[in-house]
Amino acid sequence: MDEGETLKYKNTQIGFVTGAAGIFGMLVVYYGTGANAGALGLFDTVMLGFFVILTALFSTLTVEVTDRTFRFYFGPGFWKRSFPLRDIQGVKVVRNPAYYGWGIRYTFHGWLYNVSGLRAVELDIRSEGTIRVGTNEPEQLRKALEQAQQPVA
């Protein structure tokens, strides 16, 4: 958060399915390669490391609204995106089709950033277009964005 900004809203959504899939992948690599017998090779070590990193980076999605900025990031700060509130031209709560999945992907509605569930907030951002950010609290996020955009009396 930049100096002088006031945090108005923050929520971290945990992607239980993505986290479980990552852990499952680690177990498959570990036990499927005979590592429990002490036979973990270079490829197996790389694959295990890949699943550890992937799980750590994409198992949570945090959204923040300050008095000036909307930002979100995966895991401990990976893939951080930030937009000035003045550039947000529209906000609405949406439901994504199940086939949109999770992660970072381009859809018919613009970029989607999601770790769990089907609910999201769709933002129309000047010079960026439309993006969707998944959240377990879409109404609260929409309200926080709208309130933060109101002029201070």
Regions found by a protein language model. Give the residues of each.
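Conserved beta-hairpin
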Residues: 49-90
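Generic C-terminal helix-cap and adjacent flexible tail
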Residues: 147-153
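Short hydrophobic/aromatic segments of transmembrane alpha-helices and their interfaces
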Residues: 45-46, 53, 123-124
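N-terminal membrane-targeting/pre-transmembrane regions
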Residues: 1-37, 112-113, 118-120, 128-130, ...
